[in-house]
Structure formats: structure tokens, C-alpha cells
Amino acid sequence: MVAQFPRRMGRLFLPVSTVGALLIAGVAAFSVRAQIKTVSDPRERHFANVRQLTFAGQNAEAYFSHDGRRLTFQSQRDGYDCDQQFVMGIDGSNVRRVSPGIGRTTCGLWMKKDTRVLFSSTHGGDPACPPKPDFSHGYVWPVYPTYRIYSVKPDGTDLKPLFPRTLKPGEESGYNAESVLSPDGSHIVFTSDRGGDLDIWTMNSDGTKPRQLTRTLGYDGGPWWSPDGTKICFRAYHPETAEEITEYKSLLKRHLIRPTTLDLYYMDADGSHVRRVTNDKKQNIASFAPSWTPNGKGLVFASNRDDPKRRKFEVYKINLDGKGLERITFGDQFDGFPSFSPDGKHFVWASNRNGKEPHDTNLFIAEWIP
């Protein structure tokens, strides 16, 4: 999730918020001329009846409820300086904020039977927006050490800390975010630094019995359960050279990572049999926000692979064996955070297309044509 709102910067153009949500400073503005004043492109052959759901500001990470009738999403609407969590109907109606309106939040998804929403927030450590990272060290993502996992009812009431459930006075929670509920509702997968590195963990859905799945040095994040719950996909950066390892460890001590290259992986749900889907490190390609195709045989994700300057992101589909790569969107600025409805009939994503202002990121939904 680490991850959120797209803007252009240097060699890399990524969404902004934390790690699935990124913060960008020193941003070069798009010209108004560059704005795309259409909601679809004829080359987007998998889409029918594309509809725009939000119409201003920064909106991203929309995910379907289990009954397919509602969406969670994060936004800086209503004057918030930091992302907050919202729910709405799949037609864009009945928008309601469910997070407390303080701190920074990320990665909101539905829990079993759609009775609660799962998300991470920094508000328990400090109600103010956390500081943006220092970009004098180059492009980096913040990994805030006050991200704690919460659940809340869809009407915004009954907010409860889920992990860590309790903290001593003055104790930081550590980074705990990018959480997703398993299809059967029994477990949550998430990214945490509780083991000293950014690894993927699982726990019971009540926040008990955390278990570490990945152990390779580097950032493992954005985990997502396969439709049958037997596998987990994720994005990763694993430093290899002495220089890369030194830089990674130095940044991590300051709660930062440098995401200029990210590859996609998947593994069995117990952390075994890790397999690599993309191998783009030498090309400085970043692929992120993976989620599964409805049949569980492939992934959809965002990547800057078709832009030589690595600034523009589009949505792609790929088989688990790394073959069958197909570009899905042609927004020509930023398209990302793709996700299917539970029945596989609809597709939602975030895009810069058709924005009122040069930096607007909005949510779009389409009927999916296989």
C-alpha cells in the first residue's frame, strides 16, 4: 500500500501517501494541455461503460466490499491535509468518512460480511499529519513508525485498535500497514517492521498470533490474497550489492525506503515457495499495487515499464509465470491501484485522466470484458 497520489518527479512518477501511499515534494506540474479530457481510450479493450466516481482532488486505493455494492477509498477531500478513509456506493453515492479525521491513514479494505472496515492510521501516535520526508536525499517513501491497524464500522463508529492492540505510554507502534483480509475472513496479511525489516506477516483476524512470512533483506509490501486464499502476491525491493544494502539500512533507520525499482512476487499463504513474477531491476522499473485476476492465474498491477523516463504509470496484466504481459490502460499520465469486484464483472482504478486540475487523481469503474 504502501501506497498514493500520482505526481511527476525526477525519474519516477508514483502515487503519494506512505508505502502504497507516497508523499512527493518538489513536484513538477503537468501542463493543463497535458490533461486528458476523456474517461476512456479506444485501446482499453477490456473496459465497457467506464464511469468516473470522484471529480476533484486526490482519491485512490478503492476496493470493493464483499457484496460488490460499496467501495472503500482514501482521499484528501473536504480540506484534509492527510489521506482519510471513506466508503461510498459503486455509483459514487453516499460518501461517508469512516476514519477519525486526524493523522494519516492508508489501505482501507472490508472485513468479513462488510460489517467493518480495516485500515491503518498514525493518529494514535500524533493527531497531526506526520512530516513529509526530506527529499534532499533523493526520492524516498516514508515508512511512518506510528502506523497502527484499526477497524471501524462502515458508519464511522466503534473505532478499535487491532494491531498492536495495546501500547505502553510513549511507545511507538512501529510500521504496521498494507493489511488485507483473507477470503475466508480468518486471517489478515500485512507489512510490518516489527522484526527489524519491512516484511510480510499474517495474524488472526482479531489481531492475535502474528507470524512472519518473508525474511529476505529489503522491502516486502503490498500483499494480497489469491481468490482461493492459498497464495499471496506482493511487491518487493531486495538490495543485493554492498552499496545497495548500506543505503537500504541507512534509510530504514530513518523510516524511509527508496522505491525506484520494485518487482512482483507470489508465495504460498504460509510463506513457502516464493516465486518471482517480474525481473526488472536492471531496467529501473517499478511495479506496484498487485492484485489477483478473478481466476487466480494472474495479476493486475501498475508499472512505469513503458515510459523510458519512468514517470508515467499504467495498469497491466500478467500471468504468474511472468508471461502474457498485457497493457490494460492508456491514460498516458497515471493509472494505478487496480482491483476487481468479487464476481470479476467490474474493475476499479485510480487515474489522472479527466481531472479538473493538473494534479487531480480520481476513481473510475468499468465493466470488465475478459
Regions found by a protein language model. Give the residues of each.
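Bacterial N-terminal signal peptides
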Residues: 15-28
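Blade/loop signatures of beta-propeller domains
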Residues: 35-48
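Predominantly a core beta-strand signature of beta-propeller blades
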Residues: 49-52, 93-96, 146, 157-161, ...
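A flexible loop/linker signature enriched in serine peptidases of the S9 family
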Residues: 55-58, 75-85, 100-104, 120-149, ...
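Residue-level detector of Asp-centered blade-edge/turn motifs that repeat once per structural unit
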Residues: 66-67, 112-113, 183-184, 227-228, ...
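Hydrophobic beta-strand positions that form the internal "hydrophobic ladder"
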Residues: 68-72, 117, 188, 232, ...
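Short loop/turn segments that connect beta-strands within beta-propeller blades
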Residues: 89-93, 153-157, 204-208, 268-272, ...
